[in-house]
């Protein structure tokens, strides 16, 4: 399957059309951003790491009965995916307090959240992805009540699957975001799951093993991503 025209260039991925109108090529670049794209740097191997990490996670979620857009890997940095009509709202699950939640509520980082929190954010970099709720989604027509309920159900199901997967690898799944779209009327998981869009801590040391290493200038970003992938059994080379 050959990629054709560039359709969209995001902060770390590029989307291309193919000869099949129902399929797209997703290319993972080496770019790493923080502050809604205000700070961007390149790291060798990052595109490959996130592409293969994403394929591994999407495969695990598909095995658990969660519909995903993933079709197959095409190269070290590219995969073939279904073309979705994307919902402009991100779903976030928080198992522990971190990031914006800590700043917003003034609570201690790392406290366990039971049951996990579920948040919605409008995908809009210029507005810094403002938090919204189900009422906003319905009023502004971003997604139907039924499809939003399905997105929430699938997000919690993914959390159940992934918490165990990471726990077995000696990691804490602190929080993560998912994006969904519609494929022939069905709610399907799209975009990606990688350490770029999740927080992962070492279970023993609480060392951060995700993009917070870049956001907080901790260093060792690629080494952390590779360590997480190895623990999970992701085939990299």
UniProtKB/Swiss-Prot annotation:
UniProt GO MF annotations: ATP binding; phosphoribosylaminoimidazolesuccinocarboxamide synthase activity
Cross-referenced InterPro entries: SAICAR_synt/ADE2_N (IPR028923), SAICAR_synt_PurC (IPR033934), SAICAR_synth (IPR001636), SAICAR_synthetase (IPR050089), SAICAR_synthetase_CS (IPR018236)
Protein name, entry field: Phosphoribosylaminoimidazole-succinocarboxamide synthase
Short name of one Pfam family: SAICAR_synt
The EC number(s) this enzyme carries: 6.3.2.6
Native source species: Shigella sonnei (strain Ss046)
Domain of life where this protein originates: Bacteria
Main EC class the enzyme belongs to: ligase
Family membership noted in the UniProt record: Belongs to the SAICAR synthetase family.
Pathway annotation: Purine metabolism; IMP biosynthesis via de novo pathway; 5-amino-1-(5-phospho-D-ribosyl)imidazole-4-carboxamide from 5-amino-1-(5-phospho-D-ribosyl)imidazole-4-carboxylate: step 1/2
NCBIfam families on file: purC
Gene3D superfamilies per UniProt: ATP-grasp fold, B domain (3.30.470.20), Phosphorylase Kinase, domain 1 (3.30.200.20)
A single BP term in Gene Ontology: cobalamin biosynthetic process
PROSITE patterns noted in UniProt: SAICAR_SYNTHETASE_1 (PS01057), SAICAR_SYNTHETASE_2 (PS01058)
Alphabetical keyword list: ATP-binding, Ligase, Nucleotide-binding, Purine biosynthesis
Keyword check for DNA repair: no
UniProt catalytic activity: 5-amino-1-(5-phospho-D-ribosyl)imidazole-4-carboxylate + L-aspartate + ATP = (2S)-2-[5-amino-1-(5-phospho-beta-D-ribosyl)imidazole-4-carboxamido]succinate + ADP + phosphate + 2 H(+)
GO cellular component terms given for this protein: cytosol
């Amino acid at each position: 399957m050959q990629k054709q025209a560039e359709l969209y260039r995001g902060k770390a991925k590029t989307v291309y059309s193919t000869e099949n109108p129902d399929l797209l090529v997703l290319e993972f670049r080496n770019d790493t951003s923080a502050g809604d794209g205000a700070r961007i740097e390149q790291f060798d191997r990052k595109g490959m790491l996130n592409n293969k990490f994403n394929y591994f996670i999407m495969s695990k979620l598909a095995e658990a009965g969660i519909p995903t857009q993933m079709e197959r890997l095409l190269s070290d940095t590219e995969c073939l995916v279904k073309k979705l009509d994307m919902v402009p709202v991100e779903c976030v699950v928080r198992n522990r307090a971190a990031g914006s939640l800590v700043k917003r509520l003034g609570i201690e980082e790392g406290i366990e959240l039971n049951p996990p929190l579920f948040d919605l954010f409008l995908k809009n970099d210029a507005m810094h992805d403002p938090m919204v709720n189900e009422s906003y989604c319905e009023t502004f027509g971003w997604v139907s009540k039924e499809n939003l309920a399905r997105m929430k159900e699938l997000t919690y199901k993914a959390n159940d699957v992934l918490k165990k997967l990471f726990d077995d690898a000696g990691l804490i799944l602190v929080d993560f975001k998912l994006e969904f779209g519609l494929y022939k009327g069905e709610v399907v998981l799209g975009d990606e799951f990688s350490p770029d869009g999740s927080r992962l801590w070492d279970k023993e040391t609480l060392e951060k093993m995700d993009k917070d290493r870049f956001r907080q200038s901790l260093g060792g970003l690629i080494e952390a991503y590779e360590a997480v992938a190895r623990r999970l059994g992701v085939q990299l080379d």
